């Protein structure tokens, strides 16, 4: 089985995440795309939305998308979980013969700091979702998915703009954001 793993904080999920999934399904020859929200991100200090909330929102956004599954593997660890361990788990679970690992272009700069990165590079083919406004010489070494949507979860955490939130969860995000401000 050929799989793609798309890990991230998804805090909150936005239309660029949806576009990445759509493009991956179109361009990668895969049987399944597994979205893996983190419990803790080793490169971020805190979260806007709790892990279980992010998991449920992802399920809501992608529930009708064929070949897509949302994994709660890292969330269930309830601690920092490294991509190396997640890849091993999913490789065994799906008996994967080919694994693509999708990540946003902003993560390329920290890739050399990832836990067991050299071993991970032997296990997966990294696929980078490009992003408007980010430039990196490191991109030439990777397959890319061109996504021309200039939005980030960081931006949305400071100022919710519903035009960037998937329609399936707009109301949820507005209610959650309102609760954060009260």
Swiss-Prot record:
Enzyme class: transferase
Molecular function terms from GO: ATP binding; nicotinate-nucleotide adenylyltransferase activity
Pathway field: Cofactor biosynthesis; NAD(+) biosynthesis; deamido-NAD(+) from nicotinate D-ribonucleotide: step 1/1
Catalytic activities: nicotinate beta-D-ribonucleotide + ATP + H(+) = deamido-NAD(+) + diphosphate
Record keywords, A-Z: ATP-binding, NAD, Nucleotide-binding, Nucleotidyltransferase, Pyridine nucleotide biosynthesis, Transferase
Short name of one Pfam family: CTP_transf_like
Leader peptide range in chain numbering: none
Lineage: superkingdom: Bacteria
Protein's GO biological process: NAD biosynthetic process
Known EC number: 2.7.7.18
Family: Belongs to the NadD family.
Role summary: Catalyzes the reversible adenylation of nicotinate mononucleotide (NaMN) to nicotinic acid adenine dinucleotide (NaAD).
Protein name: Probable nicotinate-nucleotide adenylyltransferase
């Amino acid at each position: 089985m050929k799989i793609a793993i798309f890990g991230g904080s998804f805090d909150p999920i936005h239309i660029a995440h949806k576009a990445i999934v759509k493009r991956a399904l179109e361009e990668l020859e895969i049987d399944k795309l597994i979205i893996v929200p983190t419990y803790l991100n080793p490169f971020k200090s805190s979260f806007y939305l709790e892990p279980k909330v992010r998991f449920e929102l992802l399920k809501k956004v992608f529930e009708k998308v064929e070949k897509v599954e949302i994994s709660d593997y890292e969330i269930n660890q309830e601690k920092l979980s490294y991509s190396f361990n997640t890849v091993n788990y999913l490789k065994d679970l799906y008996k994967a013969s080919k694994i693509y690992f999708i990540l946003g272009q902003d993560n390329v700069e920290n890739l050399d700091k990832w836990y067991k990165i050299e071993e991970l590079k032997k296990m997966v083919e990294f696929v980078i979702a490009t992003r408007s406004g980010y430039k990196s010489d490191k991109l030439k070494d990777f397959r890319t998915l061109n996504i021309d949507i200039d939005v980030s979860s960081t931006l949305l955490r400071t100022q919710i703009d519903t035009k960037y939130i998937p329609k399936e969860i707009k109301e949820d995000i507005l209610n959650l954001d309102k609760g954060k401000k009260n």
